[in-house]
Amino acid sequence: MKIHIIAVGKIKENYINNGINFYLKKLRPYCEIEIREVEEEKAPQNLSEKEKEEILRKEGERILSKIKKGSFVVSLAIEGKEIDSYKFSQFIKATFQSGYREMTFVIGGSLGLWENIKKQSHLNLSFSKMTFPHQLMRLILLEQLYLAFDGKNHL
């Protein structure tokens, strides 16, 4: 089983990096996992809708170039489907049992995700209706993946 996380931007906060490294280490016995970062576009204040769409497109094209063919793609989006931790673990299990060998989770930048990526994804998933910093979403995703794999949620 391989899990790819494609995320926009670099993480500068040590506490988030420490948490990410903690969960990556805990996940390695269960699956092969990697995080790929794509460059985040600089977004000036007071963007027009056209400027916002252009930034999302550029980031989106970078993301698309990193997605491996044949991977089950899950985009993290606030308007996506909400599920609890148990259902998330069952979803991971069912996806791999259905023949997929790789899953790719996509985390957008500060402006969100390009619509084309959401349309091309197998699933748009929301962890909450609340807004979280995109850097923190990596840590939250890794923690949920660990819960799914460690046996407490029957994976």
From Swiss-Prot:
The keyword Transferase applies. It comes from the Bacteria. The keyword Cell membrane does not apply. One of its GO terms (molecular function) is rRNA (pseudouridine-N3-)-methyltransferase activity. It catalyses: pseudouridine(1915) in 23S rRNA + S-adenosyl-L-methionine = N(3)-methylpseudouridine(1915) in 23S rRNA + S-adenosyl-L-homocysteine + H(+). Its EC number is 2.1.1.177. InterPro entries: Alpha/beta_knot_MTases, RlmH-like, tRNA_m1G_MTases_N. S-adenosyl-L-methionine binds at L76, G108, F127, S128, K129, M130, T131, F132. Its main location: cytoplasm. It is found in: Cytoplasm. GO terms for cellular component: cytoplasm. Keywords: Cytoplasm, Methyltransferase, rRNA processing, S-adenosyl-L-methionine, Transferase. Pfam families: SPOUT_MTase. Specifically methylates the pseudouridine at position 1915 (m3Psi1915) in 23S rRNA. Homodimer. NCBIfam families: PRK00103.1-3. Belongs to the RNA methyltransferase RlmH family. This is Ribosomal RNA large subunit methyltransferase H 2. It comes from Thermoanaerobacter sp. (strain X514).
